[in-house]
Amino acid sequence: MRGIALFVAGVLVGAAVQATVAQNAGAGVVGLNHVGIAVPDIPQAAAFYTEKMGFREAFRNSNPQGQPTAIYMQISRNTFLELQQANAQRPAGVNHFGLHVENMKTAVDMFRQRGATATDPAGPSAFSGAILSNVTDPNGVRIELAELGPNSLQRKAMDSWK
């Protein structure tokens, strides 16, 4: 039941993001890329989303012991669910949502001009190869900006979608 509630929350975030994307047309925001949730048991969560929801595993990151620390589940060509390990700094539940941006500098400049605080872009990510930045809304919700270059794992998963 909790998994379904998290999924519904992600869908609602997606609807809100689509309105934002429409308002930012031409400013480099492509759309919702992912919803990130922290879970206490990544393999169990991945099994649920694969077997019950029909999502496919796009890619994963594992620690040196081979245990997954993050798994991207692909919902559609352009939309993912990021499963992350819950811990003391990242409690279980919806953790953030990610926007796909065409050009990180353009997107960061636009959000800063509008008064939002955006971190300086970092990248490419050692995990996914994407260039990342973060904006935090007034309620503390983290919005991850992701520029998906041709070698990023997200881009490769999107390109392989059938």
Where are each of the predicted segments found?
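Short, flexible, solvent-exposed loop/turn segments with mixed acidic/basic and small polar residues
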Residues: 25, 85-88
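Vicinal oxygen chelate
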Residues: 2-7, 12-14, 19-28, 30-40, 61, 71-74, 88-112, 131-136, ...
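Intrinsic, low-complexity N-terminal interaction/targeting segments
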Residues: 79-81, 87, 123
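Short, charged/polar, Gly/Pro-enriched secondary-structure boundary elements
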Residues: 78-82, 140-143
